[in-house]
A protein has these predicted regions:
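Extracellular adhesion/carbohydrate-recognition regions
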Residues: 1-93, 164-170, 178
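An exposed tryptophan-centered "aromatic clamp" motif
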Residues: 75, 79, 83-98, 102-161, ...
Length: 181
């Protein structure tokens, strides 16, 4: 179930500057905090693909990934426009946002309606429905491809690194700390 997480002393103030983000549950028991500002971006220009030292991984390994910060940092170092966009945002309590794991990206596409319903209540928030229906993950598939959640098909697939897909700022939460509430 999605819910708005407010900054300290801002409960009920539905302006972008008063929220930490929108929290969603993931299939693996984790929670994720999404900042509702999005952009259609390339994951990586093909001329920079060799700067991303990450080896490609299988869909299963990408779905098992439980941390997005190191992968986002590697993409940022390689010159990723998508990583550059998402890392512009940070949470007072949780630090810098990153690109979603593949599982988180799939949950975003699955929970789009619920997320957008909450985003409509927040002044200044973007709606997922206004952007590309594929969401970049922080995982590489192969030399020229990255993993995306393909929203209209409800599945994961690979996409060329230089294709514009949605970059969604996200922080994975420590479930042992009961989210951020």
């Amino acid at each position: 179930m999605a819910r708005i997480i407010y900054k300290n002393e801002c409960e009920g103030q539905n302006r972008l500057e008063c929220i930490e983000g929108i929290e969603i549950d993931l299939l693996n028991g984790q929670k994720a905090l999404i900042y509702p500002k999005y952009s259609n971006e390339e994951l990586l220009d093909l001329k920079d693909r060799d700067r991303w030292l990450d080896a490609g991984i299988s869909e299963t390994r990408a779905l098992r990934l439980r941390d997005n910060q190191a992968a986002t940092a590697a993409l940022l170092e390689a010159g990723s426009p998508a990583a550059r966009f998402v890392t512009k945002f940070s949470s007072e309590r949780l630090g810098r946002f990153g690109l979603p794991t593949l599982l988180a990206a799939m949950e975003i596409t699955e929970q789009e309606g619920e997320i957008d319903k909450l985003a409509r209540e927040i002044d200044g928030a973007d709606l997922l429905e206004d952007f590309c229906f594929s969401v970049w993950s922080c995982s590489r598939y192969y030399k020229y491809y990255g993993w995306v959640a393909y929203g209209s098909g409800g599945c994961a697939r690979s996409n060329y690194l230089d294709t514009e897909c949605m970059a969604v700022p996200l922080v994975l939460l420590d479930t042992t700390a009961d989210g951020v509430a």
